[in-house]
């Protein structure tokens, strides 16, 4: 029998929920950990739908494209579409379009999945070539990171190319027995080599992350 979720919400909570139109829900470490869905997630989302509250999934992890995240959510039993997703890749794309409108070619220190998200948005990815000068350098959580590309990113940072970090996290949450070195730690490496920090670091808690959701659902 299908549960009537409205009956599980107290009157006091209903009153508070009535003032909420849309929620921004973190993903990594909040609705799931690695590949493990938390036991309360499905029921919580059902309660929000029953209360007429919309929600978006947001994540500081740019290593997957929106399509990849939707596939992961589907595998965990969560229904979602592109309108429900906002990643730090999308935040970086929105930021570049707003602040560097003429930028077309980017040096992207990120996974192939992330690069595909930028290419889908109309950008081109620069080669690892000192003559292929980027309009903007983007450093991200790159699980495919290799030494040559780290050196090239450091070179462009040292040359004054506009420099954006997708998120501040030092490590990415995981249920595996390892430490996933994240964007913040990669940027510290570049800083140690060049003395330069990113011009802006997006992702939570930067307000640009919520601005993207407000622009879509506000």
Enumerate the predicted regions with their spans.
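HAD-like aspartate-dependent phosphatase fold
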Residues: 1-27, 31-218
């Amino acid at each position: 029998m299908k549960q009537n979720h409205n009956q599980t919400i107290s009157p006091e909570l209903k009153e508070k929920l009535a003032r909420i139109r849309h929620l921004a829900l973190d993903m990594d470490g909040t609705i799931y950990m690695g590949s493990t869905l938390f036991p309360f997630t499905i029921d919580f989302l059902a309660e929000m739908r029953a209360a007429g509250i919309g929600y978006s999934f947001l994540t500081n992890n740019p290593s997957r494209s929106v399509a990849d995240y939707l596939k992961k959510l589907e595998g965990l039993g969560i229904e979602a579409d592109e309108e429900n997703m906002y990643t730090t890749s999308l935040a970086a794309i929105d930021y570049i379009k707003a602040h560097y409108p003429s930028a077309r070619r980017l040096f992207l220190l990120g996974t192939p999945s992330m690069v595909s998200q930028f290419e889908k948005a109309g950008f081109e990815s620069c080669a690892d070539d000192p003559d292929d000068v980027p309009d903007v350098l983007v450093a991200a959580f790159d699980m495919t990171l290799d030494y040559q590309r780290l050196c090239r990113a450091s070179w462009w940072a040292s040359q004054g190319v506009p420099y954006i970090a997708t998120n501040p996290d030092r490590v990415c949450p995981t249920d595996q027995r390892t430490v996933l070195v994240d964007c913040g730690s990669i940027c510290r490496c570049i800083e140690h080599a060049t003395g330069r920090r990113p011009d802006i670091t997006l992702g939570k808690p930067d307000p640009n992350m919520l601005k993207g959701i407000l622009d879509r659902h506000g």
